[in-house]
């Protein structure tokens, strides 16, 4: 592979805690010009304030180690498992709450979804990026943080995992209760439901874009930050729209229950909100001092 060329498979999205190999699979070579630049750590020297008495400014070096390549098949497998876990537990909580007379409470519903998101990000983020959400995948592709060629496969796997999780719930909690389906409350107009889903999706993607694509954000806390955003959104929007923020959170349970009421809201509003939230963060984020552009493929970083 020539220096500067693009590898056949995109680099795995970065996630807290897992270092990558320093050299390519062929191993290091002896001569100093033979190392592949893609496999070498990237160093950036940042100026620090001058030390009193020394009269010179000091510098510190930040080393970025590239993540190893992950095949698309492995990414899709991890994305399927992660989305399945999210939909199963985020949908199970309101079903249990309905079946057992409020045993979990609205806060429990929100916390269950937030914990599921945090768990999946920390366990699969280093493999697939833990998108779990077609709106997120589309927004990242639109902002050049994810390759468009992989979007159809990711969205298809997310939708399939959602349907599988919903039918698994239907088998566990037979008959499938309406509590797991996200539909607008009878007291909420169509416009209000649409705007609510737009706003909470905006909030979610603003946070996700910050912790997943900005090198100055604390990537090690990505799962906690995103899980907290999901919990907050469901606490606010749960009573009115169910707090979906995710087309496949609504799609799978709708198919299992045969309830497609106002489904278009949950397909369109989260996607538009995600695009807006990610775009706004990109507009307000601090620019790199060396003028570097965003990497082609980023998600929850190591």
Swiss-Prot record:
Renumbered ranges of motif NPA 1: 133-135
Subcellular location: Membrane
Keywords linked to the UniProt accession: Membrane, Repeat, Transmembrane, Transmembrane helix, Transport
Stretches the record annotates as Disordered: 1-31
GO cellular component: a single term: lateral plasma membrane
Motif (NPA 2): 246-248
GO molecular function: active borate transmembrane transporter activity; arsenite transmembrane transporter activity; water channel activity
Low complexity composition bias: residue spans: 7-21
Xref: InterPro entries: Aquaporin-like, Aquaporin_transptr, MIP, MIP_CS
Membrane topology: Multi-pass membrane protein
GO-annotated biological processes: cellular response to boron-containing substance levels; response to arsenic-containing substance
Transmembrane segments: 76-96, 102-122, 149-169, 193-213, 217-237, 264-284
Family: Belongs to the MIP/aquaporin (TC 1.A.8) family. NIP (TC 1.A.8.12) subfamily.
PANTHER family attached to this UniProt entry: AQUAPORIN NIP2-1, AQUAPORIN NIP5-1-RELATED
Entry note about domains: Aquaporins contain two tandem repeats each containing three membrane-spanning domains and a pore-forming loop with the signature motif Asn-Pro-Ala (NPA).
Function in brief: Aquaporins facilitate the transport of water and small neutral solutes across cell membranes.
UniProt-recorded name of the protein: Aquaporin NIP3-1
Native species: Zea mays (Maize)
Recorded name of the encoding gene: NIP3-1
